[in-house]
A protein has these predicted regions:
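Compact integral membrane and secretory-pathway proteins
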Residues: 2-182
Length: 182
């Protein structure tokens, strides 16, 4: 009975942490940026137009762009887009970092390991924040783009994962205290 009660006390924090961590991982595939309404209308008018000279990227490819798509575009076309061939590698590393730390968060949530979960969440958040800062610093967010659904869902996911981790810590401490009292 005590073991069943302990498992029940961990269930809700576990589910919250797993859903939050899975959401963080999912966001690297969802639109990180989305074209503004006006820019989207222009894209729809000329979907086959080339977005960047000397590339095969069409404007329809950059209407809603995920972190993975940015990394792919920048790694294969960084000289044409960013004017430096090595910069694309940096974006790949950043997106892989976000994905890796989000995956680690999911693994630690599934293993019910709240401290490593918190650490991986903080690392994922740090890399994600750096990517957002870079986009704002380069002026991308002031022009034809808004943040996409992936950007906002990442914040929801990280809050859920952190809340789940804290609740796991509390539930585990309560469970240990109850075992000591019995």
């Amino acid at each position: 009975m005590d073991t069943l009660q302990k498992k029940n006390n961990l269930f809700i924090p576990f589910i919250v942490a797993v859903i939050g961590s899975a959401l963080m991982l999912l966001t690297i595939f969802l639109p990180y940026t989305s074209a503004t309404k006006e820019f989207a209308e222009r894209i729809d008018s000329y979907p086959e137009a080339v977005a960047y000279s000397n590339t095969d990227i069409k404007v329809s490819d950059v209407k809603n762009v995920s972190m993975v798509q940015y990394a792919s575009m920048y790694s294969s076309n960084s000289k044409e887009i960013l004017h430096q061939s090595s910069v694309g590698t940096i974006y790949v590393v950043i997106v892989v970092g976000i994905g890796l730390f989000s995956l680690l968060s999911l693994i630690f949530a599934l293993l019910k390991k709240p401290i490593p979960l918190i650490i991986s969440d903080v690392l994922a958040f740090g890399v994600f924040t750096f990517l957002g800062w870079d986009f704002r610093d380069r002026g991308l967010m002031r022009s034809a783009y808004n943040w996409g659904i992936g950007y906002y869902l990442f914040y929801i996911g990280i809050v859920m994962a952190l809340v789940g981790a804290v609740l796991l810590i509390v539930a585990k401490k309560k469970g240990k205290k109850q075992l000591q009292e019995n």
